Amino acid sequence: YELDLTLLSSSEIEEVKREIAFMKEHRKLLQIEGDFYRLLSPFEGNECGFSVVSPNKTEAIAMYFQKLNFVNASWIRFKLKGLRENTLYRITADLSPSLERKENTVLHAGYNLKDKQLSYEAYGAELMEIGIPIAREDLSRKGGDFASLLFLINAI
């Protein structure tokens, strides 16, 4: 981080601690051994997506980013690469609102800002051909414009 920690609130400091712990836990996959895939080009369209898959294809982290939020748009199908077709995977994601949205009480009138978790199972073929379904509502909860989602994918 390149920021002045003395200017952060206690909730922001806790968020930084969680992010550092996540990076330490997944450093081997993200920085050393993982195969990197660009799933959606950041230079074309409104979306961007990347994933990192372990060499033995038992673990992956996928990241989805949007530029601008579309109101009343359909679901997104975020297609992955590099998984084993016949392997069953558990996909998890934290769909809780961003810290900024949680602390903005005006938004509570229009959005359900309770914490929300995604967890389901799918085969690699499904994840690569059909994709992870992403609801626009979840992107609005995460921040709307410039929202992002991080998916943890583990073989069962």
Spans of features found by a protein language model:
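Generic C-terminus detector
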Residues: 138-156
